Structure formats: C-alpha cells, structure tokens
Amino acid sequence: VFVLSDLDIGMNDWMIKDLKWDDKFKPDRGKVLSSEEIENMETFHRYLDVDGDGIPYRTIPGTNPKGSYFTRGSGHNRFGGYTEDASEYQDVVDRLLVKWETAKTLVPKPAVSFSKSNEFGIISIGSCDDAIREARDVMKKQDQNLNYLRVKAFPFTKEVQKFLDDHEMIFVVEQNRDGQLSKLLISEAEVDPKKIKSIRLYNGIPIFSK
C-alpha cells in the first residue's frame, strides 16, 4: 500500500484528525478474477478490454495457473502476447486512453462549497484546506464571498470542470513553487488560462490564512 501526502501532512500529525480504523472495511480491489472464474474461462487475456471501459480483468499470482501471464517492458498486444506490430501496439495505447476517461468517473469527487451568487472561486488541494477555510470566514465578515473546491484526485472529475465554468475568476492556492495544480487545470481541463490566478506559498512555512 502506497500512501501519498504533501509534506505538511506528512511531517505534522496535528494537521489531520486521528485515524479510526473500521474492522469491517473491505477494500474494493476492482476487476480481480477468482480461481473459479479463471477456471471457467477458455483463455485468460490480461490486456483484453471486455467491458469497453479500458480496464481489463486481472489476476493475483498463485490464484490459478490459467490466470498467469507474461509481462515485459516492450510491446504486447491486447491478448498479452509479444508484438512488434505497430497497429497492435497502438491498440493497447488507445485502450489506456479509454481507461483514463473511465478513471475520471471513479476517482474521489472534490469537496465543494458553492453559491450561485459568487463570481469568484478558490481551488486548492491537501493541507491548504484549513488556511483557506479560515480565510473565507474572515473575508465573509468583510462581505467578500468566494466559492471553494478542494481537489481530491486526478484526473479531474466533471465537478472540477463545472466549477471552472461557473466562475469568472479562479484563485488556485497551492504550496508548490511551479504551480503544478494551476498547470494541470490549464492543460487538462477546458478553461481560459486568463481565468486562473496562481497563489503559491513555497518558503517552507506552513500556509496560513493571511
């Protein structure tokens, strides 16, 4: 299990609430075939897009000999066989694009605070959240209201695109020198770059509301 977080959360456990583990939790491992399912198949093809969503079924090593497959760093076709055929290679790469579009419907949706009366919005990520919520409270007392969207995953979901469409200007707040979140929004979403105003704090001090 790989747990990815930004530096502030990784180094300061006061940034988040204590984890409460649910013993009843069962992870959704996706399209994993059981030994019985593999046995009932005529042939298992690791990279075959059966459902049309770009996500092939997979097996866990040791489940069933029929579910084994050979993987390599160079080209393979949709059936898992080695190939140097250009059309077969492109077929696999095109399937990955379908998988990418499907992922947009499966990743966690953003947290959104929205009012139709607000023309400006804030988009941010990770440990910027508390500082932004505090800043919005302060600004609200000054009759300056901004909507807020906290990104939780990439690729961006349709909710992110709608938030971009619904505002005249978006302030993208992040603790990153290069403004990576801003660049991803401009390159991956349909948005006029002039609408994006990048606000970056990257001097090593945790972000604060001022």
List each model region and its residues.
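Flexible, low-complexity linker and terminal segments
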Residues: 1-210
